[in-house]
């Protein structure tokens, strides 16, 4: 899957680093990965390709959007199913949380995300996060709770590999190519 990514289109990505990550050593070491960048730059593609390689190597992986994760965990508090539900997110060797900050969180949702990230951090499990937002903006995204945002970032960034993709949108490239072909 990683071989399908056009690194020439996103030259800001370090090829050597990306192929090193595909070796799955980050999973064995419990390292988080944070993909930063504008919409359409390939964050989700890469965040899916790496755990796919990990699953092929025998690890367990799970993919979720940030919105689905916080809704699920926050509702589990209310339902009394927190312990069971959180295992969905803390059990896999690799957890991908896609689009953190695309939609802001209320305080309960911010706390739910903290619970997942903290437990994975304590277990030494790898968490992959994608975000369109700068990390400095996370305090506002977390229901204005800068302390919870700082705690999440503290755990995510400790020993993390941070990949900031600075480049154009794949989707807009495809749109432009289609538009030109139709002329």
Model regions and ranges:
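Walker B motif beta-strand of ABC-family P-loop ATPases
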Residues: 94
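Charged, amphipathic alpha-helical linker segments immediately N-terminal to NTP-binding catalytic cores
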Residues: 1-16
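Conserved P-loop
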Residues: 13-91, 141
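A generic secondary-structure signal marking the coil-to-beta-strand transition
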Residues: 1, 31, 159-161
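Flexible glycine-/small-residue-rich
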Residues: 9, 37, 167
């Amino acid at each position: 899957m990683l071989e399908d990514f056009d690194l020439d289109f996103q030259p800001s990505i370090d090829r050597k680093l990306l192929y090193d990550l595909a070796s799955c050593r980050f999973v064995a070491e419990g390292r988080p990965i944070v993909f930063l960048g504008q919409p359409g730059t390939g964050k989700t593609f890469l965040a899916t390709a790496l755990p796919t390689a990990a699953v092929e190597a025998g690890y367990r992986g799970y993919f979720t959007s940030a919105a689905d994760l916080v809704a699920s965990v926050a509702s589990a508090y209310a339902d009394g199913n927190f312990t069971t539900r959180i295992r969905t997110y803390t059990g896999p060797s690799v957890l991908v949380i896609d689009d953190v900050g695309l939609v802001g969180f209320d305080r309960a949702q911010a706390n739910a995300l903290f619970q997942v990230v903290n437990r994975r951090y304590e277990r030494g499990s790898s968490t992959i996060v994608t975000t369109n937002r700068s990390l400095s903006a996370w305090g506002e995204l977390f229901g204005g709770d800068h302390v919870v945002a700082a705690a999440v970032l503290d755990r995510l960034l400790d020993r993390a590999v941070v990949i900031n993709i600075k480049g154009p949108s794949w989707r807009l490239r495809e749109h432009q190519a289609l538009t030109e072909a139709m002329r």
